[in-house]
């Protein structure tokens, strides 16, 4: 009897981009995910975006930070862990707006010179500068009302 063939996928950037795009919620039109010079992958404009344009509204379920962390630690989704139940926005230092599925929003990298911002009532992403075609969308993570515990986490020191 011949040995069973085992499929092995070879990691390439192209394969990873394909995986990401197959598993992402496309909530920000006219953008695409690609390699970022800032960090890993980023979100880029397919065409120019004018300052003041609303890119998307963000939805989700409200929950306190502690409950979110407890749920996050107890849910094991294997290879899908990075695509489901990991995206949130801080509404205040104790409350999060959590999305069950990963969206394009999560690929907006941090910068102290952002070209998009989170606006509230309703919670949305808005361009604060003109953004050129193929420019990366960037946001200042520190502008969210983050908890002190989150801000002092050594892994989050890039936000300071």
Regions found by a protein language model. Give the residues of each.
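Conserved catalytic SET/PR domain of SAM-dependent protein methyltransferases, capturing the structural core
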Residues: 1-160
